[in-house]
Amino acid sequence: VAGPPASGSRPPEAATVPRHAGAGSEATADVLVLGGGIIGLVTAWRAVGRGLSVVVADPEPGGGAARVAAGMLAAVTELHHGEEALLALNLRSANGWESFAAELEEAAGTGLGYRRCGTLAVALDADDRTQLRELHALHRRHGLESRWLTGRECRRLEPMLAPGVRGGLRVDGDHQVDPRRLGTALVTACERAGVDFRRAAVARLTERAGRAVGAELADGTRVSAGTTVLACGSRSSTLEGLPPHARPPVRPVKGQVLRLRVPPAFAPFLSRTVRAVVRASEVYLVPRENGELVIGATSEERGWDTTVTAGGVYELLRDAHELVPGLTELPLVETCAGLRPGTPDNAPLLGPGPLPGLQVATGHHRNGVLLTPATGEALAHSLSTGVLPDWAAPFSALRNIEQAIRDSDLG
């Protein structure tokens, strides 16, 4: 999970974890993955599939920001002006999700809650309608499939929508998955494939002669590795022992999320993900196949604070109620908050970084679940060959350094 409630500007300290059978021991592997969220896990699973020996260090594998996420696979409806470069990566990953889900479900022997249900983005007033029309035009310029619907057509698709809905975009290719089930399945698949889990927090990176050679864990274990992968999410830049020049430009972006339950008497409540911009804030409602309804999410620059606030809950319920008034009758079963790993350009940092022996898989911001298949594919390639595949090169962990060099040359 993202962590206990905390406030202030300092990152959370490494958790004290119980010693286990391997505590204080030595371990060696081809690859050491620091962080057992979905990005670290998919990296480990794909790497071991390439014949590499892999250790994952994390006190609670399968946790992280994805435990809070809604799990939208929204490459089309999440397209923002100025982020067109990210579109190709998002689409590649979205198009690979069906086969990835089938492969992972077979490997883990459990479902992921993957649903090919589509998404409906709606407008509540004239300004929202104009903004949605602009998004539709952006889709058309990029050859993306979305269909404009009138308010009446939107309500015909989703009868629970408010009468005031003015129009919408139907995107049948934007699906969803349950991130909690995804994390559980990845842990199981990794274990079955032979990944060595060390359930302890990472104390510090180990560096020798200017090269990353592994890490020390909070329980005293020392892990040596040919390549170490930094996959610590929003905390990736805070790792002890990481030289300043090798710290990725990642910051925490807080998101609060609500989980409601749809009783059988109210089912079916929504058949697909519904989203909108209300009062300049994005809100979405994601119906799970198990009767859960996820409402999210705030986007807050609050440092390391993961407190669920009355204001955050109020804003989410208020905005969601404007879309679907009937949700006020549903039981509220969970409130939670997590920290997305944000980057200056909202795009992930992948592959070899400035420190030899260290590769990076972080900075996925709001697209971590969507980009799980593509990240696993890219990191498996870079761990096997030393370089990213061509299609992932624009998201190199070195791109900020390379851009700074180009800027200095121009200056």
Regions found by a protein language model. Give the residues of each.
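C-terminal catalytic lobe of FAD-dependent flavoproteins
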Residues: 324-411
